């Protein structure tokens, strides 16, 4: 993904396919991963949805619940996700993965989260 940033912090993501997405802000975060059924994690999010790939836990003061996000973490693009769960404090994001092994492999990474506009 190529990123074009305006002076106000907003900008566009441009993909190899030629498609674009507009974002209102980019936030540098610490990214981690979680999965259901491990360490007491259930299958329901704070917004009442069922966890699945594309769900993220956030600090709702940083990313409002229901926000569409695009996540790029060091060494990988997680891609589109939605802020549907809580439990993080500050500029952090916890990305849902399908397995514990994926979570271990992901570890803790520095990344950028783009808050997408409608």
Outline where the language-model segments fall.
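Solvent-exposed, well-ordered loop and adjacent helix/strand elements within mature globular domains
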Residues: 1-118
């Amino acid at each position: 993904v190529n990123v074009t940033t305006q002076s106000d912090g907003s900008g566009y993501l441009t993909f190899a396919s030629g498609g674009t997405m507009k974002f209102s802000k980019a936030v540098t975060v610490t990214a981690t991963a979680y999965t259901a059924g491990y360490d007491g994690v259930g299958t329901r999010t704070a917004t009442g949805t069922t966890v699945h790939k594309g769900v993220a836990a956030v600090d709702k003061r940083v990313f409002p619940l229901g926000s569409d996000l695009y996540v790029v973490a060091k060494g990988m693009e997680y891609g589109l996700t939605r802020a549907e769960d809580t439990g993080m404090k500050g500029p952090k994001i916890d990305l849902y993965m399908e397995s514990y092994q994926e979570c271990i492999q992901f570890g803790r990474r520095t990344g950028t989260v783009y808050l997408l506009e409608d």
